[in-house]
């Protein structure tokens, strides 16, 4: 009997948020690239493997507390914000796009999400953040933390 395929982090976030990957280059969507997008543990592992650990940081995602979807901050490793923009924003573009490394929040984000149609439980950011708490991500979480710490050793 064939084993059922395991749902990926991207598939779980897509299902929970109701979003699908989009490619839009309108001015509103381009503006979103100024702020770091959240990545799942799988996304962050690919970014580390591509040699960008120096543009990542340990962080606690607390937005969920303010959204009312969780009562604790979620520890994770994410892209850092530079002085003005995301650490991956160079010469008016995100360098991760063409390398296939765009974090899940960025892959699913689109200018159609507005304050008047925002549902915190379906938020892309919340559903990406939940991936850092999922027991099924235990192996990738362990690898990500080890790779991140090893890459950051002096």
Where are these regions (language model features)?
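Short loop/turn segments that flank or connect secondary-structure elements
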Residues: 1-154
